[in-house]
Structures are given as C-alpha cells and as structure tokens.
Swiss-Prot record:
InterPro entries per record: MetalPrtase_cat_dom_sf_prd, YbeY, YbeY_CS
Record text on cofactor binding: Binds 1 zinc ion.
NCBIfam families: rRNA maturation RNase YbeY
PANTHER family named in the record: ENDORIBONUCLEASE YBEY, CHLOROPLASTIC (PTHR46986:SF1)
Protein name in the entry: Endoribonuclease YbeY
Native organism: Clostridium perfringens (strain ATCC 13124 / DSM 756 / JCM 1290 / NCIMB 6125 / NCTC 8237 / Type A)
Gene3D superfamilies: Metalloproteases ('zincins'), catalytic domain
Family to which this protein belongs: Belongs to the endoribonuclease YbeY family.
Lineage per the UniProt record: Bacteria, Bacillati, Bacillota, Clostridia, Eubacteriales
GO terms for biological process, alphabetical: rRNA processing
Function of the molecule: Single strand-specific metallo-endoribonuclease involved in late-stage 70S ribosome quality control and in maturation of the 3' terminus of the 16S rRNA.
Length: 168
C-alpha cells in the first residue's frame, strides 16, 4: 500500500499526479523483484519543511529535493534483490501483512524548481525523484562513483521502461 500525505499548500496535488507516482512506485518495486506486499509512505512538503527534516536527520541546513528513510538495512554495495529475495523478515518489519519499506519525503517546491532548471516537465521530475527515492529504500546509494553509476543507470532504465523521458 502506498500512503500519500500532502503537508504543503504551494502546489496542487492532483489525482493524476498521485496516480502516476503510485504507478512509478509499484513499477519500481516489481522491476526490483520485491514480491511482498509493501508499505511506502510518500509525503509532499515545501522547501522549508524539507530543510528542517534535512537538518534534523542529516545535519545539512538546506532544502533538498527528496529524502528517503528506508526501514531495512542493507550490507555495503548490496540492494534488495541481492540479499532479500528469499529472506523471511521478522514480524517487526511488517504492518499487518505488508513489509514496511520506508518513507519518501518530496519537496514539490524543489521539484518545480528543478523541472525548470532541467527544462522538462514537473511530472517528469517528480517521477524521477520518486524512482530515485524508491531505489534508496531498496538499498541503492550514490556516495561512491561506482554506486552512483549503478544507481543512475538503473533510474534511467526504469524511467525508459515507463516511457518517462527527459522530453516528458
């Protein structure tokens, strides 16, 4: 299940947008071979709120586009499909029958700014950032160049399969 929580009032959150982002989340989980029913929270905020969260959780006092809060730990250089395909999780990882993957906090304000900066649509930028964040929930990272290349390649591959291009 995907929970949507709109905590900002600067941008209208349309049913079309939420449906598209839910589709992206579900698609990424399927493509990454996640077989369990999962719970993901997607929270929409503005730059002020994400700046506060970023400062509180990472010690970085500036707005960012998206933050990911995975509930599952991953060994270094491993992602969900490398480690957990046949794994039986303890009950503490579940809410009812759903595996809790984690939370995505998305600044719609920053999303709009970046869509203008990168000269593509707001929807494309939102889909990219949600794809990026779901991959973080599944263990992908971009702290090292090799990890970054792997993650960027996977993002582009997934968005391509969804026909979400930079021209979108």
């Amino acid at each position: 299940m995907i929970f949507i929580d709109n905590r900002q009032n600067k941008f209208e959150v349309t049913e079309e947008l939420t449906k598209k982002l839910e589709e992206v989340i579900s698609f990424v989980l399927k493509e990454e071979k996640v077989k369990e029913d999962c719970e993901v929270s997607l929270v929409f905020v503005d730059n002020e709120e994400i700046r506060g969260i970023n400062n509180e959780t990472r010690g970085i006092d500036r707005a960012t586009d998206v933050l990911s809060f995975p509930m599952i730990d991953y060994p270094e250089d491993k992602v969900y499909k490398d480690v957990y395909l046949e794994h039986e999780f303890d009950k503490c990882y579940f809410d009812g029958d759903e595996l809790i993957l984690g939370d995505i906090v998305l600044s719609l304000e920053r999303t709009k700014e970046q869509s203008i900066e990168f000269n593509h649509s707001f929807e494309r930028e939102a889909c990219y950032l949600v794809t990026h964040s779901v991959l973080h929930l599944l263990g992908y990272d971009h702290m090292e160049e090799e990890e970054k290349a792997r993650m960027r390649g996977r993002e582009e591959e997934l968005l391509g399969k969804l026909n979400i291009t930079r021209e979108s």
